[in-house]
Amino acid sequence: MTLPAVPVSTVAEPPPEAAPPSRAERTLDRALRVTGGVLTVWGGVLLALLELIFSTWAWELLQGRSGAAQALVGVGAVVVGVPVVVAATVLLGSFGHRSTGGRWAVVLAALPWFVVIVAGGVRTVEGDLALVGDNVLGLALIVAGAVTFAVVGFRHLVTPPPVR
């Protein structure tokens, strides 16, 4: 003797549609995205300035040493400096991506970073130069930052956008 079966649907019910956002919510969202973009641009400028200051300071510190002390300070500056640059660049690119909601947002950080780095390599009227050609640490930081921006940008562009 069998009992009658209860009918069960095998197709999942679609979730109820959410109401479209109000005008105030859209305005707030747009304002937050613009603010995130502005913060990302200023973060790129600040990151480049800090990299130039660190590379110049570490290079001068390295030039004041000789022998084993020079090697120890140089290795320490590279071991600390390059991973910090890579981590800060990844964090800045991710912040730009999340705060603006656009996959292209890493450009907001990368363009001012490149402009400041290039400006650091140009001699001023007074003769000041933030990034000299023999500063190997500065060149390593530039390469690390540029490659990281390229990888982060490529990663954000290749990843499919989230389903909303």
Give names to the regions the model predicted.
Residues 47-82, 117-140:
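Membrane interfacial helix motifs at helix-loop boundaries and amphipathic/re-entrant anchors
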